[in-house]
A protein has these predicted regions:
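Sequence-level preference for short, compositionally simple segments enriched
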Residues: 1-165
Length: 165
């Protein structure tokens, strides 16, 4: 679907988009002894009121990947697959200029995407110490570009992994 002249994806993302880098803890309660796994995750998200879901569908069509979900009064477009993020989302925003604050956030996030893509399929315990420390630093540095920065969860555990790698 060709992009309409009246939709500016970079402007929408500059206002309502999120380049998310997080360290996650996942516990598998259904498995014996409920093992816990830690991992770095990136995602690209744009949210809007439910009435604007068509705009998010158009963004999905233009970018060429991701999913649009509608829950309650909110629509959410997200790309979570690392291959789609590295191969499609990052190149798209290198070609389409974001507002200054969002551009700085994107550049940090894109560095994180490279590190995670490079280590795809590897256990976190086998990552190089430098890569883990780089992601921790990127996460800390990007907080100043967030509208509502959150305290990162499990960061101490991520730092512990950097000491064993």
């Amino acid at each position: 679907m060709p992009m309409k002249k009246d939709i500016n994806i970079a402007a929408i993302v500059s206002n309502d988009g999120c380049f998310d880098l997080q360290f996650r803890k996942d516990t598998r309660h259904e498995r014996t002894n409920s093992p816990t796994y830690y991992r770095w995750k990136v995602q690209f998200v744009v949210t809007s009121p439910k009435v604007n879901a068509k705009i998010l569908e158009e963004i999905k069509n233009v970018i060429g990947c991701g999913e649009v979900c509608i829950t309650k009064g909110q629509a959410r477009f997200s790309v979570q697959k690392i291959d789609d993020i590295a191969g499609t989302v990052v190149p798209f925003f290198r070609r389409n200029t974001l507002a200054e604050k969002k551009k700085k956030d994107f550049e940090l996030w894109a560095r994180g995407v490279e590190v995670i893509q490079k280590n795809k399929g590897k256990y976190l315990s086998s990552w190089k110490k430098h890569d883990i420390l780089q992601l921790i630093e990127i996460q800390k540095s990007s907080a100043k570009y967030k509208n509502r920065p959150r305290q990162p969860k499990w960061l101490e555990m991520a730092q512990a992994f950097s000491k064993t790698s």
